[in-house]
From Swiss-Prot:
It comes from Methanosarcina mazei (strain ATCC BAA-159 / DSM 3647 / Goe1 / Go1 / JCM 11833 / OCM 88) (Methanosarcina frisia). This is S-inosyl-L-homocysteine hydrolase. Pathway: Amino-acid biosynthesis; S-adenosyl-L-methionine biosynthesis. GO terms for cellular component: cytosol. CDD domains: SAHH. The keyword Hydrolase applies. Substrate binds at D121, E146, K176, D180. Belongs to the adenosylhomocysteinase family.
Length: 411
């Protein structure tokens, strides 16, 4: 593609996403009128694709100067990045397929604008800020974190006394994790797997590692596709819930022997290891739905492999002697490294929370540490989404309100 064609392609993708994100459209309209971010700089490290671009445009419409880099080497869509870079008050430093050095160099370029507010997906930007650019922390009003993995990382920093700025855990908003993590991950993970493998899911043993909100979504959609789902877990309550939802539950050491297709969704490392690879079926397929590429032990798989080859775009086959194992998208985030990410309708809510939380940070002085999304913002996003869908809800009568706040009325 020429640069012009690249920009046109990105603009078309952004228009499509924009037309399916009505909540963010309402917020953008308010931002354009009120300019709540005028004079502020926002530094972002997110998956640079069409839905993210709509959020970036919304912040710029609110008066912010925005700089953005990627948060995964394989999730950037270069046409969207090119289109974003043509917008006023927006600089995009992301590119697809960058090496580790280039990845962090792009984050450095975002930090070079000296942002007042940050938005992260995985906390790499905040980590870089604390590790190498500490002199900037005094200027930072706060940040937002998009994903479960990043929130875990921030809580660990806070526990160690290392977090020196306020960060809102956008991931923990109900209008984020109940929809984005469950329905978004459930649909987009299988979109990435199906478009990459072009294989039938029905009748296969699908092993889902982790039964948090992302894992539930993956398991739910696998069931809908006709798979026999096996869940592995470390949490007894989640394991019990998975069983009551109709899935088989067992240790990974046992599941590894019978799985046809594996999807990791834990947010932790070394979920699939050398011991697992050695007992897997010939032709087993591995995909990761967690943020970082550490859930599948790729170093161990590389060391076991006698040879490797690309058998299909985005699928690498590892011949470990008596069996072949196929890995999708280098073990990176399958829904974005092998697909287009979550549907626009769920990202509409997630990014609405991001935009509102950026404004909240700009208008309120927060203490250092991890903060929840204010309940009123969470509820506001839900109401706007319902209105956009033409759905009305009931309201409590005065008698019902009195009953719910009282204690004297019993049997």
């Amino acid at each position: 593609m020429t640069e012009k064609e690249l920009i046109e392609s990105g603009n078309m993708k952004m228009e499509w996403a924009r037309n399916h994100m009505p909540v963010l459209a309402i917020i953008r309209e308010k931002f354009e009128k009120e300019k709540p971010l005028k004079g502020l700089k926002v530094g972002m490290a997110l998956h640079v694709e069409a839905k993210t671009a709509v959020l970036v445009e919304t912040l710029a419409a609110g008066g912010a100067q925005v700089a953005i880099s990627g948060c995964n080497p394989l999730s950037t869509q270069d046409d969207v990045a090119a289109a974003l870079d043509t917008r006023e008050n927006i600089n995009c430093f992301a590119k697809y397929g960058c090496c580790t050095g280039e990845y962090y160099e792009a984050i450095d370029r975002v930090l070079d604008i000296e942002p007042d507010i940050t938005i992260d997906d995985g906390a790499d930007l905040i980590f870089k800020l604390h590790k190498e650019r500490q002199e900037m922390l005094a200027k930072i009003l706060g940040g937002c974190e998009e994903t479960t993995t990043g929130v875990h990382r921030l809580h660990a920093m806070e526990k160690d006394g290392a977090l020196k700025m306020p960060v809102i855990a956008v991931n923990d908003a109900m209008t984020k994790y109940l929809f984005d993590n469950r329905y978004g991950t459930g649909q987009s993970a299988w979109d990435g797997i199906n478009r990459t493998t072009n294989l039938l899911v029905a009748g296969k043993n699908v092993v889902v590692a982790g039964y948090g909100w992302c894992g539930r979504g993956v398991a739910m959609r696998a069931t809908g596709l006709g798979a026999s789902v096996i869940v592995t877990e470390i949490d007894p309550i989640r394991a019990l819930e998975a069983r009551m939802d109709g899935h088989r539950v067992m240790k990974m050491s046992e599941a590894a022997k019978i799985g046809d297709l594996f999807v990791t969704a834990t947010g932790n490392r070394d979920i699939l290891t050398a011991d697992n690879f050695k007992v897997m079926k010939d032709g087993a397929i591995l995909a990761n739905s967690g943020h970082f590429n550490v859930e599948i032990d790729m170093e161990a798989l590389d060391s076991l492999a006698k040879s490797t080859r690309t058998v299909r775009h985005n699928i690498k086959e590892y011949d470990i002697g008596n069996r072949r194992i196929n890995v999708i998208a280098e073990g990176r985030l399958v829904n974005l490294a092998a697909g287009d990410g979550h549907p626009a309708e769920v990202m509409d809510m997630s990014f609405a929370n991001q935009a509102l939380c950026v404004r909240y940070i700009a208008e309120n002085k927060l203490s250092s540490g991890v903060h929840g999304v204010p309940r009123e913002l969470d509820t506001y996003v839900a109401k706007l989404k319902l209105e956009s869908m033409g759905i009305a809800t009931d309201e409590l009568t005065s008698k019902q309100e009195c009953y719910m706040s009282g204690w004297e009325c019993g049997t």
